[in-house]
Amino acid sequence: MTRTILILLIGFLSSIVAGCSDTNLTHDIPLVPRPAQIVPGSGNYLFSGKTVFAVENEEQAEVARSFIALFTRAAGFTPKLTVGDAEKGNVRFQTDATLKSEAYTLQVSPKEIIIEASDAKGFFYALQTIRQLLPASIEKEEVSDKKVKWSIPAVSIQDEPRFGYRALLLDASRFFIPKENVL
């Protein structure tokens, strides 16, 4: 009797342990919404005052400036921005007309970051992904502690929207909101 219970207990515990082992490493990179494809790399890219954002045109520059402002405010340094020559930077914006609207490809290595998108929305969403990968101190309104490492993990990400629209759900059964407030 005790032998049967012991065998059942060992079988039960081993099935629990086997079910808990997950070789998928993508859960180590917390991103919302989950990108279509994530391939972790090795190492980290470190942002600093020497980081250069290289963009192809003024539309991309506008997107980059809003992201650079986060570093100015929270990190106390301002990465540089060059417009017109996307090959002369550590963070490079490259237009890829084959990608869908709002889609992007993000390749992060210890030496550089390459962002490919077909439009400004794609570059914006790629930078929002980078923003999530940065330490939470990037959201502060004042300069953070000097010990913060402004780095992101090396990773390759491909993403595109699953749907052609963005939506907002108003749960009118719980909160009665006047029409004027919604609009």
Annotate each predicted stretch with a short phrase.
Residues 1-5:
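Positively charged n-region of N-terminal signal peptides that target proteins for export
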Residues 7-16:
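Bacterial N-terminal signal peptides
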Residues 20-163:
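Acidic, contiguous N-terminal accessory segments
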Residues 166-170:
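Hydrophobic faces of well-ordered beta-strands that scaffold small-molecule active sites
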Residues 171-183:
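A conserved hydrophobic secondary-structure block that centers on an alpha-helix together
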